[in-house]
């Protein structure tokens, strides 16, 4: 999924938090940053003023403005030209410092957004870098019900009619929490982290066949919903055409594997859906088993090791 953010969107999203004022270049509000650039050297999203390797958002603190003031007239004009020519998303001046008139005029003439903030430079840098990195991170929408089970994020998947929503409803009644139904969005915010959230349209809602759309927050309370959660496990529901006959090894380890999501391989456990099976209990057990495995505890491996040791002791 391609993502981008414009200068206007960034300003509106951070205006209150960073006490931003737009002082020049209002016509540049449609400038944008695109995610997934294939440039040999991608510019930093935000950083202190750098003329050689310009950032997409150039921050001018006390030292940067003092450096501009130290230049003679020609050097200052050439430097401002270089700052403007690369078409940054915006220029941001920290600590409510006065904006140099020549910089303001250049920003207006080139339609370069120029902001002033009451925050210190490092606060601007931290907030803008984090917000831009998260907004422009790779993201994907998956079909399923995303829940928090025993404090970890579990995505329940399966074909239509496999019982995902009914399972989610049973898990909610057992004290677990809903993040998103039907179309959770996952963002890779770190090399090994997928953060799952719910689209605004579907917030707090769960669709169950025969009952229609339910408001989970109203039915189960505020604690039954969760704003976001890191994806750690996928539980896939499948309806076998015949009674499954797992091999001996599968009976020991279960039907485990992984699913590739963005750049990560997420652990996956497959549960056959058959009459009489308590899927809520099985899903809870699968989650507990995954937690144990992440701690290095594998009951199947322990059993195989015990069995091997027993055979070795009995071998003459």
Swiss-Prot record:
Keywords: ATP-binding, Kinase, Magnesium, Metal-binding, Multifunctional enzyme, Nucleotide-binding, Serine/threonine-protein kinase, Transferase. It is an enzyme of class 2 (transferase). It catalyses: [HPr protein]-L-serine + ATP = [HPr protein]-O-phospho-L-serine + ADP + H(+); [HPr protein]-O-phospho-L-serine + phosphate + H(+) = [HPr protein]-L-serine + diphosphate. It comes from the Bacteria. Residues 272-277 are annotated as: Important for the catalytic mechanism of dephosphorylation. Coiled coil: none annotated. The Walker A ATP-binding motif also binds Pi and PPi. Catalyzes the ATP- as well as the pyrophosphate-dependent phosphorylation of a specific serine residue in HPr, a phosphocarrier protein of the phosphoenolpyruvate-dependent sugar phosphotransferase system (PTS). HprK/P also catalyzes the pyrophosphate-producing, inorganic phosphate-dependent dephosphorylation (phosphorolysis) of seryl-phosphorylated HPr (P-Ser-HPr). This is HPr kinase/phosphorylase.
